[in-house]
């Protein structure tokens, strides 16, 4: 049989490569479609499972929170139950700290060697242990501690904030003090840890625990601190006008012994203990006292080479020093001089200034409603005599009624130097004016033009005309007519009642008038008319107050110190010059003072 010839050589290349059958292609496409649907179904299931998982996670978080809340509530209830059944803690005050010690022949027991504290608890003194959780170094005597039911110190607290008030009288070593309590009862107390590092001085008020005998804290006493104003004055002698001779007298009495103590000792001289400044009010007594303190500080710095050396000016407010309780005023005086000695102990000059000295230390036996001066005056005398051992303390008293001060205070050896601060005359008033009218002030153009623009010449002319107006004895300046017991009469002018304070008021008024003119007329500068107007207004302000001036001072001005004034008549003719003069009724028995 003849074989069939092979037809492969007659096929196309595609047929030779094995092209898919159409039926097979449809089958494959169908399978792919089914696979896609299954993938989409699986994706949907996966998303659903993810949502279920997220919801389960959220529910789980809520469940955890609820469980935590339930746990906390259970713990709170458990703690509440524990606290309800827990015994109370007690308080104690530390009396002594006992660190751990080595046993000795007589003290080998645990109570004597182990770390412990002595406390005061429920009226008993006890030695108790300290919890290991409490740092022994953070405990101090006088401090409160917390004790458990076994009386073991489990916590350190603060210091008691309430207690009995006492006054420190004397320090006894470093940890004890002598204090004065109610009814002048003296007591020895111990200082708590809070006061060990604090500087205490005699007169300080302390709060104490009367049960334990510990001083707990230092209490500020505002009513005492207000009586003494400690300051470093910035007033110099150059700031004071019209008192040249008085200042020179004070400098000789105060600064010479301070600058040349060797010469004074060589000649057997002692520095004065005190100065009395007396005279009418408003004439510079307080300013001089401050200038003395400032000058002493400057001289002390020059002598010692210590530029940081300060001076202290203890300004005693006289009327406020008085106290209705017996012994309180004397205690305040002792406190003042104790503070002065403390400040002067390091070489700083101290001036103790008693203003209105007559209100405190008047002549014994002259009191009408009380005899408080019978104890205050001796207290001051003893303190002044005690200043003898201190070279840096000087007492300065100021008064406009020096005749009322007890003679024992004014005798030599106490207030040695007595300086009368008189009312300023015309020359002194001009000197005071120069302190307030200076060349740096704005002056009106018309006043400057009268002196070719020379500011100093303008100031000189203003002051000269103002002083002439103040010290004129014309009829317009008549103020009072004084009649004495012997029938003599004397006319007193406004110049007889002038003072440094009046001069300052005149200048202040003139400056105020200049400001008002600037606001209304737009013309700037001080004018002589402002000063003259201020003089008139200042004098007229005193029209209704002639009886406020000391009649004894009027007698001194007229040279009849011992004569009694029986009648006073005002001559002022009213602010507008139209009102009639006024008179004070004749007093049949006025005594030495009106």
UniProtKB/Swiss-Prot annotation:
Residues annotated as binding ATP: 282-287
Keyword Chaperone: yes
SMART domains given in the database record: AAA
Any one Gene Ontology molecular-function term assigned to this protein's record: ATP binding
Pathway membership, UniProt: Protein degradation; proteasomal Pup-dependent pathway
InterPro entries given in the database record: AAA+_ATPase, AAA_ATPase_domain, ATPase_AAA_core, ATPase_AAA_CS, NA-bd_OB-fold, P-loop_NTPase, Prot_ATP_ID_OB_2nd, Prot_ATP_ID_OB_N
Docks into pockets in the proteasome alpha-ring: annotated span: 593-594
Comp. bias intervals (Polar residues): 1-10
One annotated GO biological process: modification-dependent protein catabolic process
Alphabetical list of Gene3D superfamilies matching this protein: 1.10.8.60, 1.20.5.170, Nucleic acid-binding proteins (2.40.50.140), P-loop containing nucleotide triphosphate hydrolases (3.40.50.300)
Region described as Disordered: 1-23
Pfam families linked to this entry: AAA, Prot_ATP_ID_OB_C, Prot_ATP_ID_OB_N
Keywords: ATP-binding, Chaperone, Coiled coil, Nucleotide-binding, Proteasome
Entry coiled-coil feature ranges: 35-86
A GO cellular component entry from the record: proteasome complex
Family: Belongs to the AAA ATPase family.
Subunit architecture: Homohexamer. Assembles into a hexameric ring structure that caps the 20S proteasome core. Strongly interacts with the prokaryotic ubiquitin-like protein Pup through a hydrophobic interface; the interacting region of ARC lies in its N-terminal coiled-coil domain. There is one Pup binding site per ARC hexamer ring. Upon ATP-binding, the C-terminus of ARC interacts with the alpha-rings of the proteasome core, possibly by binding to the intersubunit pockets.
Notes concerning its domains: Consists of three main regions, an N-terminal coiled-coil domain that binds to protein Pup and functions as a docking station, an interdomain involved in ARC hexamerization, and a C-terminal ATPase domain of the AAA type.
Function according to Swiss-Prot or TrEMBL: ATPase which is responsible for recognizing, binding, unfolding and translocation of pupylated proteins into the bacterial 20S proteasome core particle. May be essential for opening the gate of the 20S proteasome via an interaction with its C-terminus, thereby allowing substrate entry and access to the site of proteolysis. Thus, the C-termini of the proteasomal ATPase may function like a 'key in a lock' to induce gate opening and therefore regulate proteolysis.
NCBIfam families attached to this UniProt entry: pup_AAA
Designated name of the protein: Proteasome-associated ATPase
């Amino acid at each position: 049989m003849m074989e069939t010839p092979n037809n492969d050589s007659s096929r196309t290349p595609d047929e030779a490569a094995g092209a898919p059958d159409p039926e097979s292609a449809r089958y494959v496409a169908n399978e792919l479609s089914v696979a896609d649907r299954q993938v989409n179904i699986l994706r949907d299931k996966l998303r659903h499972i993810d949502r279920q998982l997220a919801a389960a996670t959220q529910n789980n978080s809520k469940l955890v929170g609820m469980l935590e809340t339930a746990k906390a509530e259970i713990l709170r209830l458990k703690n509440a139950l524990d606290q309800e059944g827990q015994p109370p803690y007690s308080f104690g005050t530390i009396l002594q700290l006992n660190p751990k010690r080595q046993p000795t022949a007589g003290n080998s027991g645990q109570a004597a060697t182990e770390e412990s504290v002595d406390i005061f608890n429920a009226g008993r003194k006890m030695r108790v242990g300290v919890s290991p959780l409490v740092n022994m170094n953070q405990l101090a005597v006088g401090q409160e501690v917390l004790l458990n039911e076994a009386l073991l110190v489990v916590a350190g607290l603060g210091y008691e904030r309430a207690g009995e008030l006492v006054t420190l009288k004397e320090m006894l070593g470093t940890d004890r003090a002598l204090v004065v309590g109610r009814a002048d009862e003296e007591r020895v107390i111990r200082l708590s840890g809070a006061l060990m590092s604090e500087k205490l001085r005699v007169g300080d008020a302390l709060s104490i625990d009367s049960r334990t005998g510990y001083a707990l804290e230092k209490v500020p006493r505002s009513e005492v601190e207000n009586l003494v104003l400690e300051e470093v004055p910035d007033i110099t002698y150059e700031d004071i006008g019209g008192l040249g001779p008085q200042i020179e007298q004070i400098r000789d009495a105060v600064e010479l012994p301070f600058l040349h103590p060797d010469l004074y000792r060589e000649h057997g001289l002692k520095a004065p203990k005190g100065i009395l400044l007396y005279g009418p009010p408003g004439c510079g007594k307080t300013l001089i006292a401050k200038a003395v303190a400032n000058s002493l500080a400057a001289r002390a710095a020059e002598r010692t080479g210590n530029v940081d050396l300060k001076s202290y000016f203890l300004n005693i407010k006289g009327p406020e020093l008085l106290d209705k309780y017996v012994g309180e005023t004397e205690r305040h005086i002792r406190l003042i001089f104790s503070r002065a000695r403390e400040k002067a102990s390091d070489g700083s000059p101290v001036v103790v200034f008693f203003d209105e000295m007559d209100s405190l230390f008047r002549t014994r036996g002259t009191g009408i409603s009380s005899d408080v001066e019978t104890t205050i005056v001796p207290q001051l005398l003893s303190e002044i005599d005690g200043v003898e051992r201190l070279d840096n303390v000087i007492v300065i008293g100021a008064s406009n009624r020096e005749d009322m001060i007890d003679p024992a205070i004014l005798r030599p050896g106490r207030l040695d130097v007595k300086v009368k601060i008189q009312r300023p005359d015309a020359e002194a008033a001009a000197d005071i004016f120069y302190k307030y009218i200076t060349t740096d002030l704005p002056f009106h153009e018309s006043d400057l033009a009268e002196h070719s623009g020379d500011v100093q010449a303008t100031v000189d002319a203003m002051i000269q005309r103002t002083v002439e107006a103040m010290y004129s004895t014309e009829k317009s300046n008549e103020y009072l007519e004084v009649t004495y017991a012997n029938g003599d009469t004397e006319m007193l002018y406004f110049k007889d009642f002038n003072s440094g304070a009046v001069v300052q008021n005149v200048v202040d008024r003139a400056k105020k008038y200049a400001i008002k003119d600037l606001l209304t007329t737009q013309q700037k500068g001080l004018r002589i008319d402002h000063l003259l107007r201020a003089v008139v207004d200042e004098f007229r302000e005193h029209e209704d107050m002639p009886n406020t001036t000391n009649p004894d001072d009027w007698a001194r001005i007229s040279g009849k110190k011992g004569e009694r004034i029986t009648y006073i008549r005002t001559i002022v003719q009213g602010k507008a010059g139209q009102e009639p003069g006024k008179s004070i009724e004749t007093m049949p028995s006025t005594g030495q003072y009106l």
